[in-house]
């Protein structure tokens, strides 16, 4: 009997494995693809295929990431797995792989380890909304009480970083035994994916979110007025909609009088479209690159925020020397560079290339931002770091 053809109609959800080195993230990834391929169609991926992750570039930073996909009975999952700890840090901070939820893999034989904690903290800082837990290597632990203890420790760790430890699904299994086909452990993989289906909500579609367009260019067309161009980041825009221009200068209100794409007039534009938008009553000098056009009231300009930052190593083309407090690079948000000053956490004197660190940044001009917005850190046009807005201060 032929496998059913791949149905695009299933909701699409992005997930990834996180957790300490050698706790079995990649083995679990292989196990899920194998079990789901057998149950729901699709293709299994072997450990070695996943482990030899190809290099990709995100915001000028090289990251090794493996992408696999699989089907549950009611969803299509895209799943990322990284070979090294540094790749996780970079991946989560650059948002190269946006996760709707994460699978925290923790070895039942070892319990939570430093990277277990660090990945939970990173998930909190970069806005991964949901975590499900897979306690791996349970076949190596005979003592029921020890398993319960490890489960309790993981739940407490989640609580410490404001994830709901008590409500988080925790599945106990063995990825290796599942790959080897031992039925009780195959069932645990099915249980894990069912928990993901239940506990991780399908993300809101980009078109359902409030409209925002980062402005790339501004033209004035004689007899018609001012046109701003850019790619719609999220939402939908209709001719006649009221919008605000936010960032850098005081916020201005205007009305959309035309939307065009490839020189054709449209009634509306939506997330992903590269468009020109004709705005009423604004002059060319009233608007500049780096501002955003957005649904009124949906996003505010801010200058001071806390960020989680990854600083490129020398090998990645970053700085060769550390930086200290008072460091003033440019912060590249969406389409423009804004100078800002850096405050380091208490007790931190300097930051070395290759570090990841939490810092407070004060920009000289306000930028339209929400928590979760990504940015690059640049010095004279060269990328030296990547960051994500973790918390807005003012």
Curated annotation (Swiss-Prot):
Binding site for GTP: 19-26, 81-85, 136-139
Region (G5): 174-176
Chief site of localization: cytoplasm
CDD domains attached to this UniProt entry: EF_Tu (cd01884), EFTU_II (cd03697), EFTU_III (cd03707)
Start and end residues of each stretch annotated as G4: 136-139
EC number: 3.6.5.3
Gene Ontology cellular component terms for the protein in this record: cytosol
tr-type G domain span: 10-204
Key words, A-Z: Cytoplasm, Elongation factor, GTP-binding, Hydrolase, Magnesium, Metal-binding, Nucleotide-binding, Protein biosynthesis
Residue segments, region G2: 60-64
Region feature (G3): 81-84
Listed GO MF terms: GTP binding; GTPase activity; guanosine tetraphosphate binding; translation elongation factor activity
Location(s), subcellular: Cytoplasm
PROSITE patterns listed in its UniProt record: G_TR_1, G_TR_2
Task of the protein: GTP hydrolase that promotes the GTP-dependent binding of aminoacyl-tRNA to the A-site of ribosomes during protein biosynthesis.
Annotated family: Belongs to the TRAFAC class translation factor GTPase superfamily. Classic translation factor GTPase family. EF-Tu/EF-1A subfamily.
Protein name per its UniProtKB record: Elongation factor Tu
């Amino acid at each position: 009997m032929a496998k059913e053809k791949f149905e695009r109609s299933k909701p699409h959800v992005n997930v990834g494995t996180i957790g300490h080195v050698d706790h079995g993230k990649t083995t679990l990834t292989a196990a899920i693809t194998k079990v789901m391929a057998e149950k729901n169609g699709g293709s299994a991926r072997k450990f070695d295929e996943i482990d030899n992750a190809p290099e990709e570039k995100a915001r000028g930073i090289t990251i090794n990431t493996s992408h696999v996909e699989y089907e549950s009975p009611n969803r299509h999952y895209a799943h990322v797995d990284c070979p090294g700890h540094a790749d996780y840090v970079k991946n989560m901070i650059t948002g190269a792989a946006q996760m709707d939820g994460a699978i925290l893999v923790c070895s039942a034989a070892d319990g939570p380890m430093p990277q277990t904690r660090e990945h939970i903290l990173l998930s909190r800082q970069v806005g991964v909304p949901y975590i499900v837990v897979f306690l791996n290597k349970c076949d190596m632990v005979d003592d029921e009480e020890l398993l319960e203890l490890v489960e309790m420790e993981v739940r407490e760790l989640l609580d410490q970083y404001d994830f709901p430890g008590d409500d988080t699904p925790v599945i106990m299994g063995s990825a290796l035994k599942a790959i080897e086909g031992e039925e009780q452990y195959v069932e645990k993989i099915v249980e894990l994916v069912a928990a993901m289906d239940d506990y991780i909500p399908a993300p809101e579609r980009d078109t359902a979110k409030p409209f925002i367009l980062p402005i790339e260019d501004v033209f004035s067309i004689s007899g018609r007025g001012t046109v701003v161009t850019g790619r719609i980041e999220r939402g939908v825009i209709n001719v006649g909609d009221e919008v605000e221009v936010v960032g850098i200068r005081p916020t201005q209100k205007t009305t959309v009088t035309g939307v065009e794409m490839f020189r054709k007039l449209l009634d509306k534009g939506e997330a992903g479209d590269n468009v020109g938008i004709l705005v009423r009553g604004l002059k060319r000098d009233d608007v500049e690159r780096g501002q955003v056009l957005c649904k009124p009231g949906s996003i505010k300009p801010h200058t001071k925020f806390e960020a989680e930052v990854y600083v490129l190593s020398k090998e990645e083309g970053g700085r060769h020397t550390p930086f200290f407090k008072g460091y003033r690079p440019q912060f590249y948000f969406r389409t423009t560079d804004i100078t800002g000053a850096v405050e380091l956490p208490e007790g931190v004197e300097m930051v070395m290339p290759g570090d990841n660190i939490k810092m407070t940044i004060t920009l000289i001009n306000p930028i339209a931002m929400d928590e979760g917005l990504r940015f690059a850190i640049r010095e004279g046009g060269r990328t030296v770091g990547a960051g994500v807005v973790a918390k807005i201060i003012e």
